[in-house]
Amino acid sequence: MKFLFDLFPIILFFVAFKIWGIFTATAVAIVATLVQIAWVAFRHRKVDPMLWVSLGVVTVFGGATLVLHNDTFIKWKPTVLYWAFSVALIVSQLAFNKNLIEAMMGKQITLPHAIWGKLNVVWGVFFVLLGLVNLFVAYNYTTDQWVNFKLFGATGCLVVFIVGQSLWLSKYMKEE
């Protein structure tokens, strides 16, 4: 259910794009992200920092798209967000010796310390690559194809990556 809730702004963006076009869809994405944060704050009293980052990025890049009437900015938004995730993962590990993946998932699964480190780096690299793929699609395909990729392609890549990670991690997980 959380996965679908996380996709809420993307799904609304997709639907709005198909009905009204990129500029209305961009405005819808900004509002949907605000609503998502308001709901999380109301329900849990705490909003994940990455949701705030997402709101900032969609507001800045979406706002630039609307003000300048240029869809290039909204096409850069996923890449900037993916790269922000990557930087957060890698810098937190290298500069602060804090593994964010372990901090998020450490209570759910038990893994050797070295595997947590590898997992953190692999996720960081994945987000860099996903950002590059987004730019490739944004600059080499139509806006309609990019929107389809944003919902189905990027989400599909994420699901496949998570399944692959689960299979890889299963051999390291301790029996409880």
UniProtKB/Swiss-Prot annotation:
Compartment(s) where it occurs, according to its Swiss-Prot or TrEMBL record: Cell inner membrane
Organism domain of life: Bacteria
Membrane topology: Multi-pass membrane protein
Pfam families (UniProt xref): IspA (PF04279)
Record's GO cellular component terms: plasma membrane
UniProt main location, coarse: membrane
Keywords: Cell inner membrane, Cell membrane, Membrane, Transmembrane, Transmembrane helix
InterPro entries: YciB
TM regions (residue ranges): 24-44, 49-69, 76-96, 119-139, 149-169
Its job: Plays a role in cell envelope biogenesis, maintenance of cell envelope integrity and membrane homeostasis.
NCBIfam families membership: ispZ (TIGR00997), PRK00259.1-3 (NF001325)
Family in the record: Belongs to the YciB family.
UniProt-recorded name of the protein: Inner membrane-spanning protein YciB
Organism for this UniProt entry: Paraburkholderia xenovorans (strain LB400)
Taxonomy of the source species: Bacteria, Pseudomonadati, Pseudomonadota, Betaproteobacteria, Burkholderiales
